[in-house]
Amino acid sequence: MKKILYDNQMFTFQRFGGVTRYFADLMYNLPAGEFVADIPMRYCENHYVTETYGHKYETISFPKNYRIKRRIYAFVNNHISKFAAKYNDYDIFHPTYFSPYFLKTVKKRQKPFVLTIHDMTFERYPQDVLIYDRTIPHKKRLIAEADHIIAVSENTKRDIVELLGTDPSKISVVHHGYRPIAAASDKLFDRYVLYVGERKGYKNFLPWLSAIRPIFNLDPGLKIVCTGSPFTHAEQKLFARWNISDRLLHISANDAQMASLYRHALCFVFPSHYEGFGIPILEAFHNGCPVCLSNASCFPEVAGDAAMFFNPNDAQSMQDTLKEILASSTLREELRRKGALRSKDFSLERMVEQTCNVYRKL
């Protein structure tokens, strides 16, 4: 039986998020009898570990601010991870983020390590990286040192090879798998387009919103429902200047509400210039939501023929594509049907099995 040692990095940092959902789904679904997962840490408030899979860790009640608590958790958990890398019995090490703290230890112990790369966003958009953030150099170092790399899409693999000159034979593509999160709650809004996640820079939200403004004049009841961070003051001022403040709604949605938002939306729109994979696409497919995507990055690879595509640099293309979806219930039903079929290509079982194939070769 192979023992896989995972570390605490992202489980300490994130309470919710795609990276920790990926690792939790992987660790707790490894085939019994062949692999066993070890994730040594004392403190954890990550939703997928503690709620989805029911593994309880200690927490502290004070301070209330999670950013401050996270520093305490990281201080303790990082010492535990260092000790585990140095002394625990394991066959393969699989870090959850890019701190290189373990490198000397695993090399000295001759333990192979696998690195998952979810995207190359920082490398593609370095202007968005804080000056003191060490992610780019740490990530580059780990990619060079890793025994094998898992990329979550062919697009991400191409980026690693192009940007860092990595040997492509060292990289396996393992697409994300989707695990249904929750049953849908009641319908929350009427007649809306759904936008999920961050809205900054390369996400292309404001250029897309500007492009589709004429549609509001044609469809007086249409709303744009956004999840993710609340609207900033600058965004609110812009919405007011465009006279569309009443068309933009924000919700901090739980899992059941997210399922409902997808299920009742006219369509889900993802205008981003770049993503590593795009988990919301699978969420939309699974919940019967028509999908409207940028034709950039990994989106054609993930969605295939189950989505409508637009040019994210062309305002008319963005507007016309949304108009077409909103105007045709027949088209929306066809996209729902194709999305349901496409979602079967991205099962959790398939993701786990392909990852285990990487482990088996080491």
Each model region followed by its residue ranges:
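Carbohydrate transferase catalytic cores enriched for Leloir-type hexosyltransferases
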Residues: 1-362
